[in-house]
Amino acid sequence: MKKAICSFIYYKLLGWKTKVSVPDYDKYIICAAPHTTNWDLFIGKLFMGAIGRETGFMMKKDWFFWPLGPIFRWMGGIPVDRSRKSSLVDQMINIAKSSKKFHLAITPEGTRKANPNWKKGFYYIAQGAGLPIILVAIDYEKKCITAEKVIHPSGDIEKDMR
């Protein structure tokens, strides 16, 4: 039912397309870029629902106020206190390792403004928990989300992210 509703909204009502050729793992990190609008969350959740997959997401804790907080949590949101960066990667690694399934989408820019200097937390979470990273591109002009590349972190972030 959820897949049908998400598919109808994503494909029919909004007119978006997908290009997906990556496997569906029990655990993974999604690295989604570019993150340019608050609509990314809703388009991304519809995309994941339409292709029959689930994902959680981290979001600035300031967004988790009433009435949005319970809605974001229901959607898979994890509130993040960005002033306490040191433990966030370790927390996510521990959650991933102790979970049967773990799907987390991260926007590496860390902001909705253009930022060529990506934050590397998504990579360190994946490396620490032994998870693949699925690279996802969001193209608003073509109304298409692409997921066609998987990275298995080797520990050499510069080489892996080329």
Show which residues each predicted segment covers.
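Soluble catalytic domains of membrane acyltransferases
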Residues: 3, 7, 11-12, 16-162
